């Protein structure tokens, strides 16, 4: 389910397409059904044994469209559906997706669903315009493999490693300090 806000779905669409390709290539996956938040039908949700929520975070939290889906599903009878999440954020640190992940975990716990894990993507908007796309593709492939095997997964990726981020930040601040004391 591409459950993000309508204006933000364009940013996660490439991740969705790549995930769909990898899931379709798995022999174990016999039915891939991609839904959008606006075409979502809560009556069919629990016909699937696995569901992946895919969205970009808004203010480090789940978008309102995803929360609306959660609310609709609360009244439905449940089976033991496995829930996965692909969460993208515009911040450099993939850890900015942690709050969204915890909300999904808590919702799954309350609704007696099995949360199997997530792929958290930091600096998603930059990745789409850079050569780093292939790195993310490898993580999406690993994520799809875990889904195909019904395994738990906890992956995170960002365009910048901590080391590169710190080096770039230090370079910037050193330059700013030199400007100030000239």
Where are these regions (language model features)?
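A generic structural signal for short coil/turn motifs at secondary-structure boundaries
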Residues: 6-7, 92-95, 127-130
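N-terminal beta1-alpha1 ligand-phosphate binding loop
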Residues: 1-24
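Helix-loop-strand module that forms the ligand-binding subsite of alpha/beta enzymes
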Residues: 39-111
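Glycine-rich phosphate/pyrophosphate-binding loop and the adjoining helix
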Residues: 121-182
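A short, well-structured beta->alpha microelement
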Residues: 24-44
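Alpha-helical scaffold elements within enzyme catalytic domains, especially in hydrolases
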Residues: 18-21, 72, 107, 146
């Amino acid at each position: 389910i591409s459950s993000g806000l309508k204006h933000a779905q364009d940013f996660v669409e490439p991740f969705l397409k790549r995930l769909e390709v990898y899931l379709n290539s798995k022999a174990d996956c016999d039915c891939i059904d991609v839904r959008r938040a606006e075409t979502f039908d809560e009556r069919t949700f629990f016909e699937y044994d696995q569901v992946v929520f895919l969205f970009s975070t808004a203010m480090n939290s789940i978008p309102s469209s995803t929360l609306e889906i959660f609310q609709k599903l609360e009244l439905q009878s449940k089976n033991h559906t496995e829930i996965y999440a692909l969460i993208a954020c515009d911040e450099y640190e993939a850890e900015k997706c942690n709050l969204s992940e915890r909300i999904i975990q808590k919702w799954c716990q309350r609704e007696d669903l099995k949360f199997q894990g997530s792929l958290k993507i930091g600096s998603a908007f930059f990745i789409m315009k850079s050569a780093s796309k292939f790195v993310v593709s490898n993580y999406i492939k690993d994520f799809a493999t875990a889904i195909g095997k019904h395994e738990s997964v906890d992956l995170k990726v960002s365009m910048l490693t901590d080391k590169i981020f710190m080096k770039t930040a230090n370079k910037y601040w050193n330059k700013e300090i030199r400007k100030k004391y000239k």
